[in-house]
């Protein structure tokens, strides 16, 4: 067991990326569990802004970890609609699937994940905020509001505003999307949206907003609610013609709602840039701290996916006594996860510059067959492609 606040591995952040890293590590190198600490700045259950979509890729990773997502309160979304001004196409997460994806509330999902980590022997120190880290050849020192910690390896799983990332990459271009979100009651009598479906509407693109408005069904304290919001990828340099809150209020008005009646919250999402650094000697990044989906801002499956690569890099570091972690970025970029993320970033930069309302209407209303093929071939189902590669190699 470690002495005092000295550990072999410290994971900063007890969200999906951090817990996935821990659980993958338990599978790969169970001897490291007792030498690993997870630090969380808040206490579970803590509020967390997120649309809450759980794609099939996320379920595959959870299944590989021996976890069953249906233990968490959730809604099975019947169809996912991709529209322009209320008209477009629909699809499901799997071509012959029974639903599009599941929707959870992050405070419940993250609490469940943390409990699973504790069940497998991990220690989590909550209410412990990391203020700074200093990496040297001998190890890493973490300064927190609860004192000083020491580790051989640190995993930055502390989100888009990552303290760990700033420590190893102090000067970089910002790659941060913007998101606003509200939770409303379910009012089927006022909305033309089917209550069992989710909706992505790209009607805001002609206004210079590089994204969409969304409307998901969810369950909160056992009651049906709708999670609604607006996403701006911010992948291009031009600014939107209108503020995000104005565009969101306009969309809500179409459903008999008013933004002023609800609590509006916002948060950034760091999107994936293949040119960026994901590690430094003794330190690596996962989840939002590394970068997630630029196209839709989808982060849960991506965060869970990073965990396997981080755990493998950590195991290799201790086995080889080489803590440079220089192979970590290459392992991600060469994997189907990295390929999917690169495609999403490229397509976001291409697609969101096409502001013509006529073009957007044509794409979503007439090209659904092509969109569904492209989404399956390049953006999702990366876990399935990765498994095929593994089987081919064995």
Give, region by region, the residue ranges found by the protein language model.
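N-terminal FAD cofactor-binding segment of flavoenzymes
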Residues: 43-82, 184
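Glycine-rich FAD pyrophosphate-binding loop
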Residues: 10-14, 26-50
């Amino acid at each position: 067991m470690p002495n005092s606040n000295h550990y072999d591995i410290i994971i900063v952040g007890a969200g999906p990326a951090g817990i996935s890293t821990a659980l993958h590590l338990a599978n790969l190198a169970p001897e490291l569990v007792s030498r690993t600490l997870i630090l969380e700045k808040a206490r579970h259950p803590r509020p967390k802004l997120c649309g809450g979509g759980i794609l099939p890729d996320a379920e595959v990773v959870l299944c590989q970890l021996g976890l069953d997502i249906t233990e968490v309160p959730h809604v099975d979304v019947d169809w996912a609609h991709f529209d322009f001004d209320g008209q477009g196409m629909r699809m499901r997460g799997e071509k012959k699937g029974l639903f599009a994806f599941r929707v959870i509330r992050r405070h419940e999902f993250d609490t469940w994940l943390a409990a699973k980590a504790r069940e497998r022997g991990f220690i989590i120190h909550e209410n412990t905020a990391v203020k700074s880290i200093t990496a040297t050849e001998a190890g890493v020192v973490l300064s927190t509001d609860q004192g000083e910690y020491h580790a051989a390896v640190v995993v930055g799983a502390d989100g888009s505003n990552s303290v760990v990332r700033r420590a190893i990459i102090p000067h970089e271009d910002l790659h941060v999307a913007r998101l606003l979100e509200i939770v409303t009651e379910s009012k089927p009598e006022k909305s033309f949206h089917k209550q069992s479906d989710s909706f992505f509407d790209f009607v805001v693109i002609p206004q210079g907003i590089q994204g969409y408005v969304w409307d998901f069904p969810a369950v909160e304290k056992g009651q049906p609610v709708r999670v609604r919001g607006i996403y701006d990828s911010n992948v291009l340099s031009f600014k939107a013609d209108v503020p995000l809150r104005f565009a969101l209020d306009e969309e809500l008005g179409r459903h008999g709602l008013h933004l002023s009646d609800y609590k509006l919250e916002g948060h950034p999402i760091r999107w994936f840039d293949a040119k960026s650094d994901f590690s430094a000697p003794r330190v690596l990044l996962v989840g939002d701290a590394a970068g997630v989906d630029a196209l839709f801002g989808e982060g849960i499956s991506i965060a869970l996916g990073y965990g396997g690569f981080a755990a493998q890099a950590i195991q290799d570091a201790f086995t080889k006594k080489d803590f440079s972690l220089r192979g970590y970025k290459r392992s991600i970029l060469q994997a189907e996860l990295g390929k999917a993320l690169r495609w999403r970033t490229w397509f976001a930069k291409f697609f969101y510059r096409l502001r013509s309302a006529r073009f957007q209407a044509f794409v979503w209303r007439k090209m659904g067959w092509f969109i569904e093929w492209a989404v399956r071939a390049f953006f999702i189902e990366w876990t399935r492609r990765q498994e095929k590669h593994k089987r081919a190699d064995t």
